[in-house]
Amino acid sequence: MAWDMCNQDSVWTDIECAALVGEDQPLCPDLPELDLSELDVNDLDTDSFLGGLKWCSDQSEIISNQYNNEPSNIFEKIDEENEANLLAVLTETLDSLPVDEDGLPSFDALTDGDVTTENEASPSSMPDGTPPPQEAEEPSLLKKLLLAPANTQLSYNECSGLSTQNHANHNHRIRTNPAVVKTENSWSNKAKSICQQQKPQRRPCSELLKYLTTNDDPPHTKPTETRNSSRDKCTSKKKAHTQSQSQHLQAKPTSLSLPLTPESPNDPKGSPFENKTIERTLSVELSGTAGLTPPTTPPHKANQDNPFRASPKLKPPCKTVVPPPSKKTRYSESSGTHGNNSTKKGPEQSELYAQLSKTSALGGGHEERKARRPSLRLFGDHDYCQSINSKAEILINISQELHDSRQLDSKDAASDWQRQMCSSTDSDQCYLTETSEASRQVSPGSARKQLQDQEIRAELNKHFGHPSQAVFDDEADKTSELRDSDFSNEQFSKLPMFINSGLAMDGLFDDSEDESDKLNSPWDGTQSYSLFDVSPSCSSFNSPCRDSVSPPKSLFSQRPQRMRSRSRSFSQHRSCSRSPYSRSRSRSPGSRSSSRSCYYSESGHCRHRTHRNSPLCARSRSRSPYSRRPRYDSYEEYQHERLKREEYRREYEKRESERAKQRERQRQKAIEERRVIYVGKIRPDTTRTELRDRFEVFGEIEECTVNLRDDGDSYGFITYRYTCDAFAALENGYTLRRSNETDFELYFCGRKQFFKSNYADLDSNSDDFDPASTKSKYDSLDFDSLLKEAQRSLRR
């Protein structure tokens, strides 16, 4: 059906309306036309309007969290937002229409200073206070409604094709009453006189206008660069505006800025609309309104592009294809504008889906920015202090990456022409303008904060290494099948490694004998390879089971192989069925230890980890005196090794017994030869060296021993080399006694050396002996009784 929104010069067709609200969504019949002629400024309630915005801001954060947590219901929720999109379509369409230039100076007076955005400078005023006509800005729809007098019709004469963006919450739908739109000539003198007469009435609504047009960031800087032509000025302002909007999209997922004055494709190149400045954006940023939500830290990065910006007008009208954001998508300053026939927009290309996909996709302005920006923000704003929210979100993001990459393969061909329209000169100029604008936007406080963050991040990277080189294992094991298929070299280089400095590592490396060999083995030279290349190896004998890491060939061609380590050990141990490994990282690539070592290359992006729970690789605690018991491939090998150990033990015991017997034979021989002297009653503090030195005067001593007892009866044995020396010591040994010592007891060994105290001193303790216990019944009888007893026994 045809939908007449303006006059007879521009008519919207079914295809254009379907492109705005969705391919499968019909236009709502309850919004046929709007009649704004009877709208009075006094009927507007600014307090309730601002309160509604605050309520929407509070609800937007909750809904955005729901979208982030429930990505599976994205398409169902997008369909519910289409009704709210109609109001955005009407607002954006009506705002794009030109009005007379006489009413613009009053808006500049109202919005001077407080309302000006950070990326736009207020138009320079003439001496009489009026701005140049080509620099004039058009008021938005709400401005027109607030500033229009009672019973006055607003004038429109043009409308243009638009590309809509979803900016309404699906829980609070906006409904409008049916009305009739009445048009009149926009350049009539009647409209000019009305606008000039109503200037005093615009002042009471200045606070509302400031509230609607002021961005979050304070307008503390203004661009000072003067441009040679209005064409260059228009392009640079659009670029700066796009950059400021990208900051809001980066920090707040629910924020959206709509250009209120998209240029008409029917305007000729020499029309006065070509030289006019871009209209200030009506920031429908419910979550970004100052004072409504807590501030976001750290400062937003200003160097990231906005994938939802409108293309500026550089050439005659042509069709524009808006691809969804993805890792391969590159956005440049397109020369085409929105034509009459806009391409239809599927539900997967809405802003909400794009925002969710943006967190898991990579996009870079290679032609504009000459740099890549990672959009897979796994660590929040600080890469070194925050960890991954949950393992489920990682899996969701990875699956969305693969889904987006498959969809873009068929759509990149249609958008190649858009990337080639901007020449290198324009790109360099845009890049310089964007860089200068971004440098002016940073406030002194935020600059100091960014400097501190960079210093802290540099120190941490210097000590621990870059976060992209850290090890992420748990999600890698679960998602290795997803990465094995659709990752090319470009995608692999853009994909940052999952850093999990504080994440628990369940899948561990196993030990291996040939780990150094596996580290030097090159990868296969295919273009598409898996993120985690599995190449396990298990040794055959006397070696635990290990898995190896195979860095890519390109890494070793660029720099020599260097293995770095992090001094981080984990004290998690396994049960007895598996060895109690302590996880550590080794300094040497070829070092082998009983711990599981996590190796990684300095510039490598690939990590490999598999866990093998094999009975042959199970380690048990050993009872042997060795550090660990070796492993065997077969029972026969185990039996053979056990017999060898038993044989060695028997041989050792046999040798020890032979040595003991030999010493005993030598002692007995020395005793028989009268070469061993027993020395008794020595001091308890006498040492073997002292006793040897004192008795060595009689001859050469082969052996000297001292035995100390608790009761003080200490003694020693001295073995001489010759028998004559032993006899000399036995005869003259008493002369060695000192004045404070008792006389030595000197004997030849063999008589008292094996005596014990209970044997030698049986009668020393007479109290312990009871003679009554040894008496029999006959001891208590007299002689007569004994005689009678004897005779009685004989009679038997």
Swiss-Prot record:
Basic and acidic residues bias spans: 217-235, 477-486
Any Gene Ontology CC annotation: PML body
The UniProt record lists the keyword Nucleus: yes
Top-level taxonomic group: Eukaryota
LXXLL motif, short sequence motif: residues: 142-146
Bias (Basic residues) ranges: 620-629
Modification Phosphoserine occurs at: S537
Region annotated Interaction with PPARG, chain positions: 291-337
Gene Ontology MF terms in the entry: chromatin DNA binding; DNA binding; lncRNA binding; nuclear receptor binding; sequence-specific DNA binding; transcription coactivator activity; ubiquitin protein ligase binding
Region: Disordered, residue numbers: 98-138, 211-274, 288-349, 463-487, 541-637, 648-667
Biased composition (Polar residues): 114-127, 242-258, 332-344
Coiled coil start-end: none
Positions with biased composition (Low complexity): 568-603
Residue positions where N6-acetyllysine is found in the record: K77, K144, K182, K252, K269, K276, K319, K345, K411, K449, K756, K777
Domain RRM, first and last residues per copy: 675-751
UniProt modified residues of type Phosphothreonine: T176
PTM description: Phosphorylation by AMPK in skeletal muscle increases activation of its own promoter. Phosphorylated by CLK2.
UniProt-annotated stretches for the region Mediates interaction with RNF34: 348-796
UniProt subcellular location: Nucleus; Nucleus, PML body
Any one biological process term the GO annotation gives: response to muscle activity
Summary of subunit composition and partner proteins: Homooligomer. Interacts with MYBBP1A; inhibits MYBBP1A transcriptional activation. Interacts with PRDM16, LPIN1 and PML. Interacts (via LXXLL motif) with RORA and RORC (via AF-2 motif); activates RORA and RORC transcriptional activation. Interacts with LRPPRC. Interacts with FOXO1. Interacts with NR5A2.
Function in brief: Transcriptional coactivator for steroid receptors and nuclear receptors. Greatly increases the transcriptional activity of PPARG and thyroid hormone receptor on the uncoupling protein promoter. Can regulate key mitochondrial genes that contribute to the program of adaptive thermogenesis. Plays an essential role in metabolic reprogramming in response to dietary availability through coordination of the expression of a wide array of genes involved in glucose and fatty acid metabolism.
Record's protein name: Peroxisome proliferator-activated receptor gamma coactivator 1-alpha
Species classification: Eukaryota, Metazoa, Chordata, Craniata, Vertebrata
